Amino acid sequence: MKKYEIMYILRPNLDNNEVKKINDHLESVFSKKPSTILEKKEIGLKDLAYPINNHKKGYYYWFITQTDNEAVLEFNRIVKITEEVIRFIIIKE
């Protein structure tokens, strides 16, 4: 299993319940596979460096996971079809 650093940004117009629901859904991808979330941080609502889809702010989330490639591919697929995610990045350490 390899380590991956993942960060994603959610739309700023979501309420706390929606944000929690989306985070739980995205993290559940790794609980279904043999993986471990080593570290995670809810950075919160921050200004974006430039507007994305007419949004100037976003909810930032970051975590490091140790998992297999299959779980990362599934996360990538899900995050691409989740409308609330406006930007994400996955880095293999």
Curated annotation (Swiss-Prot):
Gene Ontology MF annotations: small ribosomal subunit rRNA binding; structural constituent of ribosome
A Pfam family the protein falls into: Ribosomal_S6
SUPFAM superfamilies, per database record: Ribosomal protein S6
GO cellular component, one term: cytoplasm
Name recorded for this polypeptide: Small ribosomal subunit protein bS6
PROSITE patterns named in the record: RIBOSOMAL_S6
Role summary: Binds together with bS18 to 16S ribosomal RNA.
